[in-house]
Amino acid sequence: MIYLRPYKDSEFESSVEIREIKGEEARERWRGRMSRSGAWDDHYFHLAITDDDALVGDLQVRHCGQAMPDGALELGLELSPECRGKGIGTQVLKLATERFFADGAHRICGSTEIENVAMIRAFEKAGWVKEGILRGLFNDNGKLIDYVSYSIINNNS
């Protein structure tokens, strides 16, 4: 069963691997954020994604008040490689949507690399709507990477 919950201290090394964190400064910044998971930390909110209490991923929710209106959130998730393509992403999107809509959000958006077919399927199976292509969003050593953007709206807010 898939759950979203605050991190346990003992999950630090596993979470570093899942999030592919490199460098001591980044590790320490993550250690601080992880210790405050389950609560807003500046404009970030992190939760552990677990399958029967085993850590399988990380959920990040962001709200930047200067760039987004109240009630609009951006969601990201990372799953360990062995857990991808098994429907976990779809379950996480549904759980997160339910939780953050209940907390008052009216809109949640997310994006993924245009070639990440598994995540695109997860967005669509979870009822999210494709908004468009974010052309050249990231520059990976001179190669521009396109992303596809999805969102879901709380029509009951």
Regions found by a protein language model. Give the residues of each.
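Amphipathic alpha-helical recognition patches that constitute DNA-binding helices
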Residues: 3, 14, 74, 78, ...
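GNAT-family acyltransferases
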Residues: 1-82, 99, 143-155
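Conserved catalytic-core motifs of GNAT/GCN5-like acyltransferases
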Residues: 66, 111, 129-146
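Conserved acetyl-CoA-binding loop-helix of GNAT-fold acetyltransferases
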Residues: 85-99, 117-125
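Conserved GNAT acetyl-CoA-binding A-motif
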Residues: 102-112
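Short amphipathic helical patch at the helix-1/turn junction of helix-turn-helix
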Residues: 79, 113-114
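Alpha-helical hinge/cap motifs
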Residues: 76, 83-87, 132
